[in-house]
C-alpha cells in the first residue's frame, strides 16, 4: 500500500533500512528492490541515510541481513570505513530506524481546533495555531512550558498559517483577510494581546487594483534570510512582502483558483513553488520574470486541488498533498511550459469539505502526469492537510509523513513508497504534524483540540510494528 506507478523505470541499488532484533524493524523494507523511481533522488537518499559501503560489505554476512547498530559500532572501532568515525549518513542510518511512533502524550488541549503546528528550525520551540485565535509558543527544552500565548488580531474563521522567522524572534500569521500580521514574541509577557502588550504590525497583501475586494491568505512563509515573506491567497495570487522596505514587492496572478500553499525552494530565495485548487503546481523564478509574470514551469499530475507543498530544500525536489488523496513527488527538471493533457471527467459536484472521495475516481490517472512518485493510503478531506519530508539531520529525508482526515498520521518510505507506520490516537482530523529536526520525536495536532507528542520507545523494548493500535487515554 502507498506507492503507485511512476514514469521512471530505472532500478537503483538496495538501501539498507532495517535493524537488529533489539531495534526498530520494518520487514517490508528490508532490502526491497527499488523500481520506478528516479535514480538520482533514490541515490541521494541512500547517500544521506545508508551506512558506509565498507561497513555494508565487510560486516554483512548476506545483503539480505540487517546492519545493526552494534555491528556498526564494531566496524567503527575497527576503522572499517577508514575514517575512524561515523559519517552523517551512518548516524542517519541508525537514528532513522527509531521512528517516533510510540507512547503518545498530550502536550496541550484546547476546546478549539488546532490548524497548524511546527517545530522551529533548531527544535527548541514549537508553535501551534488554534481556531479560537490563540497561537501558543512552547519551549521544548523547558518541559513544553508555554513561553508565549499570542491572541491573534483580525482573525476571520481561523488562523490559516503561521511562520517563525529564522532568528526565532518574530512570528508572522495569516487569516482569511488580505492583511497578515507579524509580532515580536521575545517579550517577558507570557500573553500577547493584539496591540496591547506587543505590537502586531499589519502586512497588507492587497493592491490598488483589488477594488476593495476582500480575500484571504492561505499560506505564509519566511525566506531563509528573514527579509521576505511569501504568501498564497484566495484571489489566485502569489505575493512577496519585503520586510525591510515594509512594502509589497511582488504580486502576480499565479493560478486559476485559490493558491493554497507556497514556499521558497531553497536558501537563495530565487525559486518559489506554489500549489492551487486548479490542480497544478508551478515553479516561479524571480530572476527572469517577464511582464506577464509567467511561471518557469508547470507540473501537472494531480486530479484535484493541492492542499500543501513542502520543498526538499535543494531547489530541485518537492512534494505536494492533493485532494485526489495522494502525495506526489516532483523533480522540477521535468516541468512543462504549459498545462497539457485532458483529465478524465468525474462528478463535478464533489466537495472535499464534506463528501467522501468518489470510489470510481481513485484509480484515475492524469494523462500527462509528470510526478516522479505517488503515495497513497491517507485521506485528504475536510481541510488543507499538510505533508512533509522527514528531517535531513536525523533521517536523511528518507521518509514522507502527513496528517489525515481519518485522525491518523501516516509515514511513507520515500524510495520504496511503503507505508511504514500509522500513528493512531486522535479522535478527529489531523491537519498538521511536525517531526523534530534532531530527535525521534513527532508532534501531531488535530481538530479534536489536542497536541500529541510521539517518541521512539527505547531501552530495547518491543520493536515498533507497521501500524499501532489505538491507545486508551
From Swiss-Prot:
WD repeats lie at residues 212-242, 254-285, 301-331, 377-413, 425-455. It comes from the Eukaryota. InterPro entries: DCAF, DCAF11/LEC14B, G-protein_beta_WD-40_rep, WD40/YVTN_repeat-like_dom_sf, WD40_repeat_dom_sf, WD40_rpt. Signal peptide: none annotated. GO terms for cellular component: Cul4-RING E3 ubiquitin ligase complex. SMART domains: WD40. Keywords: Repeat, WD repeat. One of its GO terms (biological process) is proteasome-mediated ubiquitin-dependent protein catabolic process. The keyword Nuclease does not apply. Belongs to the WD repeat LEC14B family. This is LEC14B protein. It comes from Lithospermum erythrorhizon.
Amino acid at each position: 500500500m502507498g506507492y503507485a506507478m511512476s514514469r521512471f523505470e530505472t532500478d537503483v541499488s538496495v538501501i539498507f533500512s532495517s535493524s537488529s532484533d533489539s531495534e526498530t524493524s520494518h520487514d517490508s523494507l528490508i532490502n526491497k528492490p527499488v523500481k520506478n523511481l528516479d535514480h538520482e533522488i533514490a541515490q541521494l537518499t541512500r547517500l544521506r541515510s545508508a551506512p558506509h559501503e565498507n561497513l555494508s560489505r565487510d560486516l554483512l554476512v548476506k545483503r539480505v541481513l540487517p546492519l545493526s547498530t552494534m555491528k556498526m559500532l564494531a566496524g567503527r572501532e575497527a576503522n572499517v570505513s577508514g575514517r575512524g568515525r561515523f559519517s552523517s549518513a551512518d548516524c542517519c542510518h541508525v537514528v532513522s530506524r527509531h521512528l517516533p511512533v510510540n507512547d503518545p502524550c498530550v502536550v496541550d488541549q484546547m476546546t478549539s481546533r488546532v490548524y497548524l503546528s511546527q517545530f522551529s528550525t533548531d527544535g527548541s520551540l514549537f508553535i501551534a495555531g488554534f481556531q479560537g485565535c490563540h497561537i501558543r509558543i512552547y519551549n521544548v527544552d523547558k518541559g513544553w512550558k508555554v513561553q508565549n500565548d499570542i491572541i491573534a488580531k483580525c482573525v476571520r474563521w481561523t488562523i490559516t498559517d503561521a511562520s517563525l522567522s529564522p532568528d526565532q524572534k518574530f512570528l508572522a500569521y495569516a487569516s482569511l483577510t488580505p492583511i497578515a500580521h507579524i509580532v515580536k514574541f521575545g517579550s517577558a509577557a507570557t500573553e500577547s494581546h493584539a496591540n496591547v502588550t506587543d505590537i502586531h504590525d499589519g502586512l497588507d497583501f492587497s493592491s490598488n487594483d483589488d477594488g476593495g475586494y476582500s480575500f484571504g491568505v492561505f499560506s505564509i512563509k519566511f525566506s531563509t534570510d528573514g527579509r521576505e515573506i511569501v504568501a498564497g491567497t484566495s484571489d489566485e495570487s502569489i505575493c512577496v512582502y519585503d520586510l525591510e522596505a515594509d512594502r509589497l514587492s511582488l504580486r502576480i496572478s499565479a493560478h486559476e483558483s485559490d493558491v493554497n500553499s507556497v514556499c521558497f525552494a531553497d536558501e537563495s530565495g530565487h525559486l518559489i513553488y506554489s500549489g492551487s485548487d486548479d490542480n497544478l503546481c508551478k515553479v516561479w523564478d524571480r530572476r527572469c520574470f517577464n511582464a506577464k509574470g509567467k511561471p518557469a514551469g508547470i507540473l501537472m499530475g494531480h486530479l484535484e486541488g493541492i492542499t500543501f507543498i513542502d520543498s526538499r530544500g535543494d531547489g530541485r525536489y518537492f512534494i505536494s498533498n492533493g485532494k485526489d488523496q495522494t502525495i506526489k513527488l516532483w523533480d522540477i527538471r521535468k516541468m512543462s511550459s504549459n498545462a497539457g493533457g485532458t483529465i478524465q471527467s468525474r462528478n463535478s459536484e464533489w466537495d472535499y469539505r464534506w463528501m467522501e472521495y468518489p470510489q470510481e475516481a481513485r484509480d484515475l490517472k492524469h494523462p500527462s502526469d509528470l510526478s516522479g512518485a505517488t503515495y497513497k493510503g491517507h485521506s485528504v478531506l475536510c481541510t488543507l492537510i499538510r505533508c512533509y519530508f522527514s528531517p535531513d539531520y536525523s533521517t536523511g529525508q528518507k521518509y514522507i509523513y502527513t496528517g489525515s482526515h481519518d485522525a491518523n498520521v501516516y509515514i511513507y518510505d520515500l524510495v520504496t513508497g511503503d507505508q511504514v507506520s500509522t500513528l493512531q490516537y486522535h479522535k478527529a482530523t489531523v491537519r498538521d504534524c511536525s517531526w523534530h529536526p534532531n530527535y525521534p520525536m513527532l508532534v501531531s495536532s488535530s481538530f479534536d483540540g489536542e497536541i500529541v507528542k510521539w517518541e521512539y520507545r527505547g531501552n530495547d523494548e518491543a520493536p515498533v510494528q507497521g501500524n499501532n493500535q489505538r491507545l486508551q487515554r
